[in-house]
Amino acid sequence: MLEVVSILGFSSFQDMGRNGFRSLGLSRSGAADYYAMAEGAALLDQSPNSTALELIGNGGTFNVLEDCMVALTGATMLASADQKPLAWNASHYLYKGNMLNLTTQQNGRYSYLHLRGGFKAPKVFNSCSAQPVAGIGQYTRPKDILAQLENKQDPIAVSYTHLTLPTICSV
């Protein structure tokens, strides 16, 4: 469980999005970088559709409220826990009382903070992806508590051969 101390840009919960609701005027939403989502899921041995925090801008600071495992993927940021550098595109065990700091995107636009077990977020139309402009979910704010799903089952084995990523552009 994490507490948002500060956010330097925009951040919201995202998963692989919602399909089948365009006829109702609702876009797919979901993570902007499917590969970063799949990478985070692989690092934590969980479903690629697990909810992660998508960070757009310059990251933020998070107080670790209980021991947890996180993964950092997507656009590289400078990352540290209690001022000790953390590798990007890797998983890390954080301890209660640590201060996780993510700053300065080095490349790209979308960074992801994954929590083992996934973040707890409301599911709307089969997805936990926020789409604030449509009134679904909201951007994260200081003092928000980012909790793990209550269902703390053992990690599941995922077959990535069946993971279908959408085509971003065709040639």
What are the residue ranges of the model-derived segments?
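Intrinsically disordered, low-complexity linker/loop segments enriched in Gly/Pro
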Residues: 71-142, 147-150
